[in-house]
């Protein structure tokens, strides 16, 4: 957090900070149905993925940034958002691990298809909510924390309404 952010949500444990555990998110390895990986018509291995273009999401961390989910594939494109990755992969450019809840429409419409991996086709990282330990949180930030906690486990179809404060 480095004194820059009041709140952070991360899939990583941040050394020196105590995070509040939130939900896990299912990430699915996917590619367009016409992608070469789907043409093998068999269970895929890590070696099959190494020679293919992998689309990875740039980590926004300032120290030790990581390309999230990168396998070390020979070719990779690093993009700035999950939406961009979804657009690239659903148009036939590479493969990626993407959050299932964000790609349900593409899966349903046949723009994306889960890769038949022998292992690791689904990942379920747990996310953590961190708040600044360097300064007290203001009322607006506390309301945001309450909203995040309230809707963290709510179905995506839940209407968003602010929590009631006494």
Predicted regions and their residues:
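Short, charged alpha-helical segments
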Residues: 124, 136-139, 143-146
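A bilobed periplasmic-binding-protein/Venus flytrap-type ligand-binding module shared by bacterial periplasmic
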Residues: 30-34, 126-137
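C-terminal regulatory
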Residues: 14-93, 98-123, 146-166
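Short, Asp-centered acidic motifs that coordinate Mg2+ and/or phosphate
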Residues: 2, 6-7, 95
């Amino acid at each position: 957090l480095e004194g820059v952010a009041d709140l952070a949500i991360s899939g990583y444990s941040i050394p020196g900070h105590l995070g509040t555990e939130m939900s896990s998110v299912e990430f699915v390895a996917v590619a367009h149905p016409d992608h070469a990986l789907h043409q093998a018509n068999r269970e895929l291995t890590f070696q099959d993925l190494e020679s293919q273009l992998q689309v990875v999401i740039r980590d926004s961390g300032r120290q030790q940034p990581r390309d999230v989910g990168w396998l070390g594939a020979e070719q990779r494109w690093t993009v700035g958002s999950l939406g961009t990755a979804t657009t690239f992969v659903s148009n036939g450019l590479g493969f990626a691990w993407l959050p299932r809840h964000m790609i349900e429409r593409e899966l349903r419409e046949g723009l994306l298809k889960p890769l038949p991996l022998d292992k690791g086709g689904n990942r379920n990282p747990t996310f953590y909510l961190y708040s600044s330990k360097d300064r007290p949180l203001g009322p607006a930030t506390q309301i945001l924390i309450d909203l995040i906690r309230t809707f963290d486990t709510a179905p995506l179809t839940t209407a968003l309404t602010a929590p009631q404060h006494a």
